[in-house]
Amino acid sequence: MAVVGVPGWIGSSSVNETGQRWMSQAAGQLRLGVPCWMSQFAGRSREIIHTLGADHNFNGQWFRDRCFEAGSAPIVFNITGDLVSYSKDVPLFFMYGDTPNEYVVLNIHGGVHMWGRGGNGGYTHSGGDGNGTQGGHVIQNDIGGRLRIWNYGVIAAGGGGGGGIAYRPHSGAKWQDIGGGGGRPFGGAGGGRYSGGAASYEGPGGGYDYGNAHSGAGGNAGAAGQNAWSDGGKVLKVGVGGASGHAVFGSSPTWGVVGTIYGPRV
């Protein structure tokens, strides 16, 4: 909600909005300096504040829903625990151009990480081309400077998946599908009869060595996955590593503190 416009019962409306009966205290809640006119309260809203703890399967739709729930009011997110998007295909936080808030603040506490999810390792079985997938993005910003970021922690794009390879040691031998490793964090392994590893929160999945064929390891925070390669034998498909995700993409936010960032940003 917001304080009613002029003409209207601004005094009682401001009490309902801020919970403060003293004009000076209500002005503080509405981010107005003192002295000021009560008419300046019209149409203003107090900040809506949310605190987010750790969640390694965070759905960015929750974040978007809270923004719309607040209407035009400014909204603040205090991030106190590590967050990882539930999907490499969905940014951790996303703000399209229709986001209604006066402004959106992200306060990322010290030691806290915000992650895009890691990309999957490439595979050559089932028609796969062997290429690792791109890592996930952290923040999609389409509201420009209305997004204000104070990063005392870490914003880390998901690492890309490693490349897979189809290999046989000599003509007449059976083709072997060797999957790539997953990007950090939680990127899936490429699979196949042989495969690199899935990523954990702490690190990317490794590649797999089979004779002279080598699938690529997944990428670390903000890094591309490793290409597959061979140093002998016959190869049918040699996949490249996936690119990292973006830490912040779209339009430039207002940076209060840039802090530590892995991956491209605007």
From Swiss-Prot:
A motif (GRM 9) lies at residues 223-228. A motif (GRM 2) lies at residues 126-137. Keywords: Host-virus interaction, Viral attachment to host cell, Viral tail fiber protein, Viral tail protein, Virion, Virus entry into host cell. A motif (GRM 8) lies at residues 214-220. The keyword Cell inner membrane does not apply. Receptor binding protein (RBP) that is at the tip of the long tail fibers and serves as the phage recognition site for the attachment host receptor. Probably uses the host receptor OmpA. One of its GO terms (biological process) is symbiont entry into host cell. A motif (GRM 3) lies at residues 157-171. This phage use outer membrane protein ompA as a receptor. This is Receptor-recognizing protein gp38. Belongs to the receptor-recognizing protein gp38 family. The keyword NADP does not apply. A motif (GRM 4) lies at residues 174-184. One of its GO terms (cellular component) is virus tail, fiber. A motif (GRM 5) lies at residues 187-191. Pfam families: GP38, Gp38_N. The record marks W9, W22, W37 as: Interaction with the fiber protein p37. The N-terminus is involved in binding to the fiber protein p37. The C-terminus contains glycine-rich motifs (GRM) and mediates the host specificity. The glycine-rich motifs assemble into a 3-layered PG(II) sandwich domain. It is found in: Virion.
